[in-house]
Amino acid sequence: MEKSRQFDLAPYIDHAALDPATTREAIATCCAQALHHKFVAVCVYPSALSQAVELLRGKKVEICAVIGFPSGASTSGSKLYEAQEAAELGATELDVVINLGLLKDGNTEAVYNDIAPIVEATGLTVKAILEMGRLTESEKRLAAEICLDAGVQYLKTSTGWGKGATVADVRLLHQISQGRVGIKASGGIRTVEQAIALIEAGATRLGTSRGVELIQQQQQLWEQG
């Protein structure tokens, strides 16, 4: 309980609305919740950007679009187009899934060229999603180094569509990046205790669709004294 007093979770939360069946009503709710709780960002599909931008225009909430999500297996050209279109629609941040197949093939140049043009062309905050639950220890390190070289601003653990964030993976990314970029933990974050453990390991953002639940849990702990 004491640790729950040390962190206000709201400024860490990227409030996600990434169910494939997400409706306009759900996007409106997501944006309203982000405003009410002062979350740092909402995270949506590109098709929901216009609505999110309209609802959050002039507000202190970042608008993040996912790119190549969730597989990362789109062509590099299509990812670049998707990213540029998202930027034109008003996204302020991009969560881009790397190509895991290229990484596992050892084609490091292609992995770099899948990400770097997006960073350069859009000028937005780019978070590279490594999907660490699918990688070996050496692949995790390699993926992180490639993305750092590509100029991303964040390393992100997972899409949330597989194995979610672990303290060990966040700690590894923090060790590799040495403070050069932010770390976003995402996937399976359901409790305040999990959230705090990830922050203590080095996470600077938490990607979750359960942001409101986490805030409610934390408020209950505060009220219990």
Swiss-Prot record:
Catalytic activity: 2-deoxy-D-ribose 5-phosphate = D-glyceraldehyde 3-phosphate + acetaldehyde
Transmembrane segment boundaries: none
Record-listed E.C. numbers: 4.1.2.4
UniProt GO cellular component terms: cytoplasm
Active site: 95 (proton donor/acceptor), 156 (schiff-base intermediate with acetaldehyde), 184 (proton donor/acceptor)
GO molecular function: deoxyribose-phosphate aldolase activity
Subcellular location: Cytoplasm
Function field: Catalyzes a reversible aldol reaction between acetaldehyde and D-glyceraldehyde 3-phosphate to generate 2-deoxy-D-ribose 5-phosphate.
HAMAP family for this protein: DeoC_type1 (MF_00114)
Family: Belongs to the DeoC/FbaB aldolase family. DeoC type 1 subfamily.
Record protein name field: Deoxyribose-phosphate aldolase
Taxonomic source organism: Synechocystis sp. (strain ATCC 27184 / PCC 6803 / Kazusa)
Lineage, highest ranks first: Bacteria, Bacillati, Cyanobacteriota, Cyanophyceae, Synechococcales
Name of the encoding gene: deoC
